[in-house]
């Protein structure tokens, strides 16, 4: 059932215009930036948006010199966290998603996580991609 739901909602998301996705990205990150948890966070782990996902690169670029930004790197089917200080540290990795070139993995505490999703229900429950990374 989840597999069919994933497929259905990815198809629907892919139908959204680029202008709408840009608007939604801006709105979502405005909400995050105004949240007290974000304001207090020193270490933020965020996925690097891909395809029709919410565009995270502008957010990363905005905050990379103001907070410690960590992004995922997949290695042997395991998601690892890597601290980046520049977008130049990213290169195309698994599934065509930008990943850090560094293999210096972080295993400490993170203050805030921005998680990818295919869809959320009205109660805030998330349907992800089913890889078990998040």
PLM regions: where:
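Short flexible/disordered coil segments
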Residues: 100-115, 132-134
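Surface-exposed, charge/polar-rich loops and edge strands
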Residues: 15, 108-113, 122-125
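N-terminal active-site beta-alpha-beta segment that forms phosphate/nucleotide-binding
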Residues: 1-106
